[in-house]
């Protein structure tokens, strides 16, 4: 089975200049859509369990769902990633369950809501890196808080995210601080704040350089060229699915996401992991609303759930192709987690800081 570390996958992405969409998984339909799209496009996969998904489905159920996907598609390299761990303990339990990558979100306190100070973030991330790398498991850290540069409001989803109004110093990751953070923690990947936020309501109008700072990505990448950058809250909020939802009884107000072309620009400057959740939610909801409206006598869940798989699969295919992920699964030769531990121990994977 091709369960690999995120570090190996993102190193390959950096070498060949592509990005990898990281899709949140809550149920069978999402998992199947992601894997069928990856199979069709020969794409490596990052699937992640958010705090909300772990609460909804339970970490053991998610683990076996992902392992089942790996068993059915053994030729596709898969990273099983725990998203937004709020403490080293959460990350440690995920590693015990078999996750090959964890995120220690020390930008927030353990309640997942209160912005943490820098020293706290460094300390808990260092702790997580120490035991994770000893297991060959990758670690993603976070510096800065997700939120809107347009309004200053923090972004929350699935119970994780700062609350209230934040200033620009919290909403934009500082390049110098990023370099210091990576040097001290040795994280494999760093989620940075550039003006994106969780959920569907990211921007009230198509984003500009004032509300989405691709320039900040370039500045951070120049300081930590070997550290893989992560864009959270990067759903593009497809307008066609918004229209379908509202056509069939939905009431979602006007909103815009992160344009795919802006993500592609970020990939040129070190973005290797792109977190996507809302796009699949919108496609799934739109497909169900449309099917039930057109088939009011239907009550077999398999029939309308199959429509969600089709809708989400198309989104996944589009992202794999746009980010350059397509065609790379077969090029990755899996390294075991034990092999990754040996590489960490030899210092081969220590970060470069300019």
Curated annotation (Swiss-Prot):
Role: Catalyzes the aldol condensation of dihydroxyacetone phosphate (DHAP or glycerone-phosphate) with glyceraldehyde 3-phosphate (G3P) to form fructose 1,6-bisphosphate (FBP) in gluconeogenesis and the reverse reaction in glycolysis.
Ligand binding (Zn(2+) 1): 84, 198, 232
Native source species: Pseudomonas aeruginosa (strain ATCC 15692 / DSM 22644 / CIP 104116 / JCM 14847 / LMG 12228 / 1C / PRS 101 / PAO1)
Annotated pathway: Carbohydrate degradation; glycolysis; D-glyceraldehyde 3-phosphate and glycerone phosphate from D-glucose: step 4/4
List of catalytic residues: 83 (proton donor)
Cofactor: binding comment: Binds 2 Zn(2+) ions per subunit. One is catalytic and the other provides a structural contribution.
Domain of life: Bacteria
Key word Metal-binding present: yes
Alphabetized InterPro entries for the sequence: Aldolase_TIM (IPR013785), Class_II_FBP_aldolase (IPR050246), FBA_II (IPR000771), Fruct_bisP_Calv (IPR006412)
Record SUPFAM superfamilies: Aldolase
Catalytic activity: beta-D-fructose 1,6-bisphosphate = D-glyceraldehyde 3-phosphate + dihydroxyacetone phosphate
Family annotation (NCBIfam families): cbbA, FruBisAldo_II_B
Name of the protein in its database record: Fructose-bisphosphate aldolase
Broad EC category: lyase
């Amino acid at each position: 089975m091709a369960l690999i570390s995120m570090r190996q996958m993102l190193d390959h992405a950096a070498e060949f200049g592509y990005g990898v969409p990281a899709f949140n998984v809550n149920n069978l339909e999402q998992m199947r859509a992601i894997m069928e799209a990856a199979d069709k496009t020969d794409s490596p996969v990052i699937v992640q369990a958010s705090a909300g998904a772990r609460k909804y489905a339970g970490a053991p159920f998610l683990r076996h769902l992902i392992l089942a996907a790996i068993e059915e598609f053994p030729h596709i390299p898969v990273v099983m990633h725990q998203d937004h761990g709020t403490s080293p303990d959460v990350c440690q339990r995920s590693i015990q369950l078999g996750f090959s990558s964890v995120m220690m979100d020390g930008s927030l306190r353990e309640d997942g809501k209160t912005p943490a100070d820098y020293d706290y973030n460094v300390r808990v991330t260092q702790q997580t890196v120490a035991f994770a790398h000893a297991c060959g498991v990758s670690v993603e850290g976070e510096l800065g808080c997700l939120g809107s540069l347009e309004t200053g409001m923090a972004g929350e989803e699935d119970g994780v995210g700062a609350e209230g109004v934040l200033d620009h110093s919290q909403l934009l990751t500082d390049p110098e601080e990023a370099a210091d953070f990576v040097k001290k923690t040795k994280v494999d990947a760093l989620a940075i704040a550039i003006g994106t936020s969780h959920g569907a309501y990211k921007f009230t109008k198509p984003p500009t350089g004032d509300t989405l700072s691709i320039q900040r990505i370039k500045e951070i990448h120049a300081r930590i060229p070997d550290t893989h950058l992560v864009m959270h809250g990067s759903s593009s909020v497809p307008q066609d699915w918004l229209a379908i939802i509202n056509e069939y009884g939905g009431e979602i107000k006007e909103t815009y996401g992160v344009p795919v072309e802006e993500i592609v620009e970020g990939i040129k400057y070190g973005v290797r992991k792109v977190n996507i959740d809302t796009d699949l939610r919108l496609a799934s909801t739109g497909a169900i609303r449309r099917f039930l409206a057109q088939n009011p006598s239907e009550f077999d869940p398999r029939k309308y759930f199959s429509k969600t798989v089709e809708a989400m699969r198309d989104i996944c295919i589009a992202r794999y192709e746009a980010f350059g992920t397509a065609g790379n699964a077969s090029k990755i030769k899996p390294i075991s987690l034990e092999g990754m531990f040996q590489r960490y121990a030899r210092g081969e994977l220590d970060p470069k800081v300019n």
